[in-house]
Design a protein with these regions (language model features):
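N-terminal ligand-binding/catalytic initiation module
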Residues: 1-159
Length: 159
């Protein structure tokens, strides 16, 4: 995929310069910008309004730690994230991903795509996503519960 519109090329380059180590997010932005190219060509007022600049930058991105106890009473620490994109049509909506591969780039990518998924439902909701590098596989139900309780307690400080 490539972008031919100079305005969208500039937007994509700004995102690349700002977030060079976030390949999942950069791929999602490239895909969306190239898809929206015909729309931007027909509506120059979107450029004048800075619509795309606002669309590709999250309103909030938070990284935090989640400390929880395993079944042996040992404290474990995981990294967690919450990214919120574009509340123009309503509050943020999006789920949680718990997987060892989770990082900021993945959560930004998922939150960015959530904007479009939510807008297509017709419900007034913006896009958001949260997650952690916590791996629930092999954990007991009690460990998963303690992790989730700690995750929500920590997240509540920011939303």
């Amino acid at each position: 995929m490539s972008i031919h519109n100079p305005y969208l090329q500039k937007i994509y380059q700004q995102v690349c310069d700002r977030d060079p180590n976030q390949p999942e997010f950069l791929n999602a932005v490239m895909e969306v910008l190239s898809t929206l190219e015909p729309v931007i060509e027909r509506h120059p007022e979107y450029e004048a309004a800075g619509l795309m600049e606002r669309l590709v930058e999250p309103e909030r991105a938070v990284q935090f730690r989640v400390a929880w106890q395993d079944d042996q009473g040992k404290t474990q620490v995981n990294r967690a994230f919450r990214v919120q994109f574009n509340s123009a049509i309503g509050p943020y909506k999006g789920g949680l991903r718990l997987h060892p591969s989770v990082n900021l780039s993945i959560i930004k990518f998922l939150a960015f795509e959530q904007i479009f998924k939510n807008s297509l439902t017709g419900l007034p909701m913006g896009g958001g996503k949260g997650g952690s590098d916590f791996n629930p596989k092999g954990k007991s139900d009690a460990e998963i519960m303690r992790f989730c309780q700690s995750f929500m307690t920590e997240l509540s400080r920011y939303i």
